[in-house]
Amino acid sequence: MHAYRSHTCTELNAAHVGQEVRLSGWVHRVRDHGGVLFLDLRDHYGITQVIADADSPAFAELETVRAEWVIRIEGRVKARDASLVNPKLATGEIEVYATGMSVLGAADELPLPVFGETDYPEETRLTYRFLDLRREKLHQNMMLRSNVVRSLRNRMWGAGFNEFQTPIITASSPEGARDFLVPSRLHPGKFYALPQAPQQFKQLIMVAGFDRYFQIAPCFRDEDPRADRSPTDFYQLDIEMSFVEQEDVFAAVQPVIQGLFEEFGHGKRVDADWPRIAYRDAMLWYGSDKPDLRNPIKMQVVSEHFAGSGFAIFAKLLENEGTEIRAIPAPTGGSRKFCDRMNAFAQSQGLPGMGYIFWRKGDDGAMEAAGPLAKNIGPERTEAIRQQLGLGEGDAAFFLGGKPETFEAVAGRARTEIGRELGLTEENCFKFAWIVDFPMYEKDDEGKIDFSHNPFSMPQGGMEALEGDPLKVHAYQYDLACNGYELISGGIRNHKPEIMFKAFELAGYPKEEVEKRFGGMVKAFRYGAPPHGGCAAGIDRIVMLLADEANIREVIMFPMNQRAEDLLMGAPSEPTNEQLRELRLRVVPKD
């Protein structure tokens, strides 16, 4: 018999009754029922109940064990009485009568319990992450992640892609976030960078003549933390293809992602219709470039109904160029109480509030419009709004005005909140959409032209488009949204040096700087580069959706906290003076 176990803690069943076995694992919990000990022994695979009475040679030793001790049990498999069978356990038909026990690893008093799902402060959970990971839900999440990665690999191989690894330490490049820099000991004063993504390398793989590439790639970005984003590092399914257009990438990716969600979605419906929605339409209809299509609410422009109306605030606003009024329909939201609650929500998001109209049955039995706006703009305009929005008795509509960029984000959050409160957002399904036609450029906080997304995307219209207004240029850039999250981002690449130089010039990068920062890729493009494109899917976020978790740290084995600290390993840490001397660095105190 093996030194530690003859079976795992999920293998034994009625067919093993009478056999002598050896099990090893953690003490999940112990119960003393008046001279009979019941011990749940847990390993990676499951739980087996162990019993010992006063006649058992192991009884005295088992009385000393505590939760999370690692022990080895020798014993005999017994059938449980029919009334004691536990259908929730794979081993619920049997129990092991202990005849011997050895302690393999004792445990100190636990800072957090493993048994049960009691909520503990995140600081405690991350400091003792190895204990946290023993808890059932988190253990399941990590196994889900492992299985998702394995499935992705199999699906990519099956689709004719080849897996290649790219460098983990490389040169710094501007890709939308801060780099993690690594000082060079051999080249004092110079720094490497951890890659924000394998972007340049995967494009070079295409230039090198390989056709379909993928990688489960680690990416490193010094970012501000969010619930759906790690502040330091993450993993992505990285994809690149040669001789493709946008629709070719979509056709290659959809079977992989759709199949993955069907495999691990716990029976939730996975919609096969993935619409293409222009970025501008997504912002107009949903107030977000990652819309949750489970919510049927679509916002609309209703400026014409307020221009010259009796509602002076909106009428005066519309006299300014670039302003508009948008409506958020709220089917079944036609009560003053609900409307006031949503108005308060808008105020909590930093806006003065939202105007609203709701439709109800009047004293004469006919439908009438009510609310502050209805009184100001009159029945003809409110009726025109109702008809445009397709609303009726018992419904409501909310209104926001100004320049779209000042209220779109809040409008999107209000749409989400309205859908949730009214029960309009469909549960138990995954709805996908490709967001396309992203603007190539945007203005930064200082009013300067900058890239809005990936700087390596091909501008729609090529060089000719770059000769006009940069803010009107669209890129062959696309995202895949699912249930309100961005799962994939990608683009058709700019593989022509002259167009690349012009694109970067508009964003303030002279040719010399582009040559310096991207010299390897520019050089490669001068030796015959194929048209190519691809994308990257965030694995952490995909697993978060499949696990139905609200926080990405619940699907990462050893995550950082909100302050980008590893509480278990003590990172970041101070270097020794010797390390600093070797690197010819010194720490400058904060002002």
Swiss-Prot record:
**What's its EC?**
6.1.1.23
Alphabetized GO MF terms: aspartate-tRNA ligase activity; aspartate-tRNA(Asn) ligase activity; ATP binding; nucleic acid binding
Protein's GO biological process:
aspartyl-tRNA aminoacylation
Question: Does the entry feature the keyword Protein biosynthesis, yes or no?
Answer: yes
Spell out the reaction equation it catalyses: tRNA(Asx) + L-aspartate + ATP = L-aspartyl-tRNA(Asx) + AMP + diphosphate
| PROSITE patterns in the record | AA_TRNA_LIGASE_II (PS50862)
Subcellular location(s): the record lists: Cytoplasm
Task: Look up the record and report any one GO term of the cellular component aspect.
Answer: cytoplasm
Task: Provide the site residues for: Important for tRNA non-discrimination.
Answer: H33
Q: Does the keyword Aminoacyl-tRNA synthetase apply?
A: yes
Q: Which region ranges are annotated with the description Aspartate?
A: 199-202
Residues holding L-aspartate: E175, R221, H453, R493
Family (UniProt): Belongs to the class-II aminoacyl-tRNA synthetase family. Type 1 subfamily.
Matching HAMAP family: Asp_tRNA_synth_type1
Q: What does this protein do?
A: Aspartyl-tRNA synthetase with relaxed tRNA specificity since it is able to aspartylate not only its cognate tRNA(Asp) but also tRNA(Asn). Reaction proceeds in two steps: L-aspartate is first activated by ATP to form Asp-AMP and then transferred to the acceptor end of tRNA(Asp/Asn).
Q: How does it assemble?
A: Homodimer.
This one is known as: Aspartate--tRNA(Asp/Asn) ligase
Q: Which species is this UniProt entry from?
A: Cereibacter sphaeroides (strain ATCC 17023 / DSM 158 / JCM 6121 / CCUG 31486 / LMG 2827 / NBRC 12203 / NCIMB 8253 / ATH 2.4.1.) (Rhodobacter sphaeroides)
Q: What is the lineage of its organism?
A: Bacteria, Pseudomonadati, Pseudomonadota, Alphaproteobacteria, Rhodobacterales
State the gene name recorded for this protein: aspS
